Amino acid sequence: NRKRNMSENKKTNQIQPPEEIVLCGASAYNQKFYINENFKNLPDEIKNQLKVMCVLFCADIGGILQLVFDEEGNLEFRTACNEDDLLYDDIGSGLKIKELRQKNEDLLRGLELYYKVIFDKLEE
């Protein structure tokens, strides 16, 4: 499932920048963690918490996990898996995300606030 990074404005056929920004992600397939360079100024402790959260999710559930800011600055958990991945736990995925949201509520709320402050400044 390849996601579109750019959206097309139907009236003028101009290419617009994406309205969503990936904060970080991890993959059980290549066993890697990624954090968006736009967030390199986050404290190391927060980056480490994100890494642990994403990597452990992929180790437990499988597939790919991304934390994505939507156009309003809300942080969403997105999962995906290869079509032939029989080990991916689809039901466990939803339960694990709910658990992570509850356990890391303060961290996630702080990241949303950080995003809104930083990216509102960039748009001015």
PLM features per residue range, with description:
Residues 113-116, 120-123:
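Charged/polar positions within long, soluble alpha-helices
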